[in-house]
């Protein structure tokens, strides 16, 4: 919920500030939503409650992609994209090391959660959950839950990588 709330806030920023130059928010969200759509379909199981997310996630993804393409013409959402140059563009070395560490950990977490959610669940070693544990909400998450969290975390990882690669200047919507 918290990860999705952050994406909601980024969308509210676009609505409040205007879409000019907000490719730095929208492209990572699109990538995360595409991965989420794939993981929802790949890992959906019999224990997952409703079939609705299997259809809503891809529909939401298509709507978000359509909004991006509509904003390209109207509000110059791609403003600044052509000036994006990859490189390590943070001058403060301790900050650069910290951000690189966050990016590496984010890539690892996202990759493991999306590609091998079952292994991530087994890594906690919960074993078999008793009915009392399940009633208390202490059971293991489903594979789709772990994979979706990895796809949401991917958005934040890409945002952080963009700050490292392009520098922090003008990235206040991403950093907040």
Predicted regions and their residues:
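Cytosolic juxtamembrane helix and N-cap/initiation of the first transmembrane helix
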Residues: 77-108
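Transmembrane alpha-helix/helix-exit interface in multi-pass inner-membrane proteins
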Residues: 105-125
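Membrane-water interface at the C-terminal end of transmembrane alpha helices
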Residues: 43, 61-80
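Core segments of alpha-helical transmembrane spans in multipass integral membrane proteins
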Residues: 1-16, 31-32, 104, 140-165
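Hydrophobic alpha-helical membrane segments
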Residues: 25-41, 175-176
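Membrane-interface interhelical connector segments
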Residues: 119-138
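Short juxtamembrane and helix-loop transition motifs at transmembrane-helix boundaries
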Residues: 14-24, 132-143, 165-174
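Membrane-helix boundary connector in multi-pass membrane proteins
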Residues: 38-55
């Amino acid at each position: 919920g918290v990860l999705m709330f952050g994406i909601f806030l980024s969308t509210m920023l676009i609505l409040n500030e205007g879409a000019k130059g907000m490719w730095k928010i929208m492209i990572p969200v699109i990538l995360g939503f595409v991965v989420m759509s794939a993981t929802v379909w790949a890992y959906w199981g019999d224990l997952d409650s409703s079939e609705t997310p299997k259809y809503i996630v891809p529909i939401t993804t298509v709507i978000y992609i359509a909004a991006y393409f509509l904003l390209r013409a109207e509000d110059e959402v791609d403003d600044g994209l052509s000036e994006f140059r990859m490189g390590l563009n943070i001058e403060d070395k301790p900050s650069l090391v910290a951000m690189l560490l966050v990016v590496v950990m984010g890539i690892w977490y996202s990759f493991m959660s999306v590609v091998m959610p079952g292994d991530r669940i087994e890594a906690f070693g919960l074993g078999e959950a008793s009915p009392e544990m399940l009633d208390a909400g202490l059971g293991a998450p489903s594979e789709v839950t772990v994979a979706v969290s990895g796809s949401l975390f991917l958005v934040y990882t890409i945002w952080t990588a963009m700050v490292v690669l392009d520098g922090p200047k003008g990235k206040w919507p991403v950093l907040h």
